[in-house]
Amino acid sequence: IAGLNGVENMRSLSRNGFSQVTVIFKESSNLYFMRQQVTERLAQARPNLPAGVEPQMGPVSTGLGEVFHYSVEYEFPDGKGAKVKDGEPGWQSDGSFLTERGERLTDRVSKLAYLRTVQDWIIRPQLRTTAGVADVDSLGGYVKQFVVEPDAAKMAAYGISFEELAQALEDANLSVGANFIRRSGESYLVRADARIKSADEIARAVIAQRQGVPITVGQVANINVGGELRSGAASRNGYETVVGSALMLVGANSRTVAQAVGDKLEEIKKTLPPGVVIVPTLNRSQLVMATIKTVAKNLVEGAALVVVILFALLGNWRAAVIA
């Protein structure tokens, strides 16, 4: 990247598990052409990076691009004030939360992971289609993970190695095409979607066979819902939540973009699962409108003050207004 034409300055910030490189180009440089050049250089550097490291570029936005913040939270935090109907989606009498897919969330991590899943897979994709929005950031909660805890004694008893277990988990989470089948002059596409959606599906994944009997993951390991290690959190009114931030495209109008985001969120609310709500916390358009009203008020007051001063000096209202 240092050899790119037009680079004026570079700086980096490195922390545990995170590294950020900022490249500053000349003011006259074309933004999109420079991004293309950086993308090509990142592709060249990718083979030299450690396994599992995937470099990404930031959105086409600036440090002042955050025009709308919102909170994704439970309608009744910790179930306080909620109408409990056991067996139906929502809070249960035992303090757990039942999702519309029938998944029971019993601990803090799984409940926050559910909010993050709603933000990343339901709200964010829809909000990114709004005109003028460069990207949508997520903060707080936990990125959902399925935690597999092998039992060494059971694995030894079945003669299962850790490599076999890892390979079985990888094979059980694939989505592949199987070409097509022709029948009566028609073609039918065949696709095998084996991507994991629940802990039960992981437990049923077959590792190997012993004397013709399949050995599943659930027989040699415990599977739980967990969260990816995080370096930050978000809260509102004393309860942990997930915060979303809409980033404005460079050169866009902050007032119109913020209004469009607010309107889009009203549409998205209809697609949320039961018990989850969106609460706007920052709307840049409100700040802009308040500023415009303040400027207009100051102009009117200033004009009136000038007229009064001119009248005091000239002693004639008509002359003061004309002047």
Model region roles, listed by residue range:
Residues 1-307, 312-313:
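Membrane-proximal extracytoplasmic
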